C-alpha cells in the first residue's frame, strides 16, 4: 500500500493510499489521531452508491472517532466510484442514484441487470476490502490484534454483508438501507453466516429499499444479537441520533 497524500486536520492524520489488488488500483484512506499510541479499535466504513471514501458522513465520524476515542478508521472507494472514475462519470452516477432515492418516475428500477451489476461489484470489492484491511493492520497507528468493526449502509451493506460473512476478524457490524430481494440466494446465504452482533438501521418510507425487503434481510442475519432501528422518512433521512447509537454499539462490542 503506497502513501500518496497526507494531511493533519485538527489533530487527526488523514492518509491517502493506493493499493494494487488483482490488477486494479484501489484508493484507500486511513484516519488516526496524531501522536496517539497504536489504536485498539479499527472501524471499516463502506460508502453508499454514487458516494466515495471521504463522503461527508464517513469523514465526520472518522475524525470524531479518532479525536474522542483514538480509534482508526479505514475507507476505500468501491469499484466504479470515487477516484476510480472521472468527474463526469461521478456526476452521471449521482443523478441516477438521486432519482432512485427520490422515487422519481422513470428512474432505473432494480431489475435483474442491476442485481447482476451489484453482485459483480461485490465480487470485486471483497478481495479489495480484505487486502486493504491486511495493509492497514500493518500500519504503526494500529495496535496488535485490534477490535475491528464494520459500518456500511445502502451499497455499503450490499458489499458489506458478503465481505463481513467472509471476514472472521470483524467482531460487529452496522448495516442498513438495503434489503433481501427475491432470488438473491447468495446474499441470503451470506447474511445467514453473519453471527456477530448486528445493528440494522432502516427508513420506513425508503424508495430504494422496500420495507418488506429490509425486514427480510434483518430476519436473514444469523446473529442472535441483532437490533433493527426503524425510522420514518426516506433513504437519506436517517435521524442524527442514530450516529450516537452506532457509537454506543461499537463501544459495547469493541470496548
Give, region by region, the residue ranges found by the protein language model.
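Short alpha-helix in the alpha/beta-hydrolase fold that links the catalytic acid
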Residues: 58-59, 163, 186-187, 196, ...
Amino acid at each position: 500500500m503506497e502513501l500518496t497524500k497526507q494531511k493533519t486536520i485538527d489533530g487527526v492524520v488523514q492518509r491517502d493510499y493506493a493499493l494494487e489488488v488483482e490488477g486494479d488500483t484501489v484508493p484507500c484512506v486511513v484516519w488516526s489521531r496524531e501522536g496517539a499510541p497504536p489504536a485498539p479499535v479499527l472501524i471499516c466504513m463502506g460508502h453508499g452508491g454514487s458516494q466515495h471514501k471521504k463522503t461527508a458522513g464517513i469523514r465526520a465520524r472518522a475524525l470524531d472517532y479518532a479525536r474522542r476515542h483514538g480509534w482508526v478508521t479505514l475507507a476505500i472507494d468501491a469499484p466504479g466510484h470515487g477516484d476510480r472514475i472521472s468527474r463526469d462519470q461521478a456526476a452521471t452516477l449521482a443523478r441516477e442514484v438521486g432519482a432512485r432515492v427520490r422515487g422519481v418516475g422513470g428512474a432505473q428500477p432494480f431489475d435483474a441487470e442491476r442485481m447482476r451489476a451489484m453482485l459483480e461489484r461485490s465480487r470485486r470489492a471483497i478481495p479489495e476490502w480484505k487486502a486493504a484491511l491486511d495493509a492497514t493492520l500493518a500500519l504503526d497507528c494500529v495496535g496488535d490484534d485490534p477490535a475491528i468493526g464494520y459500518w456500511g449502509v445502502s451499497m455499503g451493506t450490499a458489499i458489506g454483508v458478503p465481505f463481513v460473512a467472509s471476514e472472521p476478524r470483524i467482531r460487529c457490524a452496522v448495516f442498513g438501507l438495503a434489503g433481501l430481494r427475491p432470488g438473491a440466494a447468495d446474499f441470503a446465504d451470506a447474511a445467514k453466516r453473519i453471527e456477530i452482533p448486528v445493528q440494522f438501521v432502516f427508513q420506513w418510507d425508503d424508495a430504494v429499499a422496500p420495507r418488506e425487503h429490509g425486514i427480510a434481510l434483518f430476519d436473514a442475519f444469523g446473529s442472535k444479537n441483532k437490533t433493527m432501528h426503524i425510522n420514518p422518512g426516506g433513504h437519506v433521512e436517517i435521524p442524527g441520533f442514530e450516529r450516537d447509537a452506532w457509537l454506543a454499539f461499537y463501544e459495547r462490542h469493541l470496548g
